[in-house]
Amino acid sequence: MSNGWEPRTRLGRKVADGEITSMQDALQSGLPLKEPELVDQLLPGLEDEVLDINMVQRMTDSGRRVKFRCVVVIGNRDGYVGYAQGRDDQVGGAIQKAIDVAKLNIIDVPLGSGSWEDRPGGRNSLMRRTTGKAGSVEVELKPAPRGLGLAAAPTVRHVLELAGVEDAWTKCHGNTRTTLNLAKATYNALRNASESRTPEHTRQVRQEAQE
């Protein structure tokens, strides 16, 4: 490849050989997504945003060890979004690790105009209500009519914007001051919406790739 990427997986080789030319086809192929470079090939121009940076301390036999934990969301603002956290001794390393894992967690969000107040055929909102959980936090997302905007907390809004959702009602329950769980619950809600239309065999393979 011109960018120096040498595919290591069957899915990667299919992308490199031109057999798979879109992210949608890759996600529906039933093959595990294990190479961040593959996502770069199919979704050039992905944006990333660091939602949270925390210092994590742990006692070891050699003394106190400090690492940084970063929470990152990525997306193309048109139906694709990923989420992950990364840890490293350096902030930059933690961010890059999170970005790479977020690419492996990329999902295809079913955009639409599911609000009864909206005209059918749009892609400004979600198709239907969806919920997601992470820790004590639960996030509910509901379709909203065009022009409403995102009635959401800042963390939830960042995830939805990068996913391409322009209008939505949201509700959050639990300890919503925890950015990590709030972002993950929002991502899980979008993933649940995505999986509601995904064949079972593809869903299982994708889950294996994220573990």
Swiss-Prot record:
Keyword annotations of the record: Ribonucleoprotein, Ribosomal protein, RNA-binding, rRNA-binding
GO BP of this protein: translation
Gene Ontology annotations for the cellular component aspect, listed alphabetically: cytosolic small ribosomal subunit
Region (Disordered): 191-211
Subunit text: Part of the 30S ribosomal subunit. Contacts protein S4.
Domain notes: The N-terminal domain interacts with the head of the 30S subunit; the C-terminal domain interacts with the body and contacts protein S4. The interaction surface between S4 and S5 is involved in control of translational fidelity.
Cited function: With S4 and S12 plays an important role in translational accuracy.
Name of this protein: Small ribosomal subunit protein uS5
Species of origin: Natronomonas pharaonis (strain ATCC 35678 / DSM 2160 / CIP 103997 / JCM 8858 / NBRC 14720 / NCIMB 2260 / Gabara) (Halobacterium pharaonis)
Lineage: Archaea, Methanobacteriati, Methanobacteriota, Stenosarchaea group, Halobacteria
